[in-house]
Regions:
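Residue-level signal for the start and early helices of compact helical domains
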Residues: 1, 6, 20, 27, ...
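Solvent-exposed loop segments that connect transmembrane elements
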Residues: 1-8, 43-56, 92-123, 165-167, ...
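Membrane-embedded beta-barrel scaffold of Gram-negative outer-membrane proteins
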Residues: 9-73, 79-81, 85, 89-95, ...
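Gram-negative outer-membrane beta-barrel transporters
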Residues: 37, 57-165, 235-237
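Flexible domain-boundary/linker segments
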Residues: 37-39, 50, 87, 99, ...
């Protein structure tokens, strides 16, 4: 227990994974699909204690879900890829979860008098997206004077998820609706690569992490994602 003075260690986690799936390969691509269940006994958690975070074995956590990925070549030059995941995650047992010290959550989750933890059994863990998916397309082509090029576009969606236990979505959440694209070239001799790229072209705003601020009751800290970003990369191969 990391809350015990002088003890900064925790016991190992014990994970049990069950998965059943199907793989299909055909002329122009493939599809993989899997159902899974993961159970973690004694999962390690950084529990907030008011003045800092303590690593401890918190109980049992279960993830159940569906995973799908595949690729399909529409032609020799154009390839479509996709992946998706659905996860139902729950704390089966979490007796010493971080209680709400911000006053932003429901009163039932407020810190009890003289305590800094609360029973979160039955609640959903923070930071695990219930649904996420990625769709991408890559078009490859030959240059008139030799060399090769490609154009790639990708869309990523991650359903909004809370970033800290008991802090509402409206205060601290993470999600993605990002469009990325790149245009690249390789010289005929393979010595030079050049790529023009853009990330988060939708300029989607979200936090990537958030947590209660140590020694400042009623407040929290967070880090935003990168805004719309453009760049050019030139590489010499030896």
């Amino acid at each position: 227990d990391g809350r015990t003075p002088g003890n900064r260690t925790a016991d190992p986690e014990e994970a049990t994974n069950i998965e059943i799936g199907l793989k299909a390969v055909f002329d122009n691509g493939y599809v993989n699909i899997a159902l899974f269940e993961q159970s973690i006994e004694g999962f390690q958690s950084n529990v907030f204690g008011g003045t800092g975070f303590n690593l401890e074995n918190a109980g049992k956590e279960t993830h159940e879900g569906l995973e799908l990925d595949g690729m399909y070549a529409l032609s020799d030059d154009l390839v479509i890829g996709f992946s998706a995941m659905y996860i139902d995650a729950v704390y089966d047992e979490f007796l010493n979860g971080t209680c709400d010290a911000t006053g932003l959550s429901d009163p039932e989750f407020a810190c009890p008098t003289g305590a800094s933890t609360i029973d979160l059994s039955g609640n959903s863990p923070a930071g695990i997206h219930e649904l996420s998916y990625n769709v991408n397309a890559t078009y490859s082509f030959s240059m008139p004077r030799g060399g090769n090029g490609f154009f790639r576009v990708e869309y990523l969606h991650e359903k909004d998820v809370k970033l800290a236990d008991l802090i509402p979505f409206s205060i601290a959440k993470r999600g993605s609706d990002n469009l990325n694209a790149s245009l690249g070239f390789t010289s005929a001799d393979g010595e030079w690569d050049a790529m023009l790229w853009g990330r988060n072209l939708t300029d989607h705003e979200s936090l990537i992490s958030a947590f209660p601020t140590p020694a400042q009751p009623g407040s929290f800290s967070g880090y935003p994602n990168a805004p719309r970003t453009y760049g050019f990369t030139l590489r010499k191969n030896f």
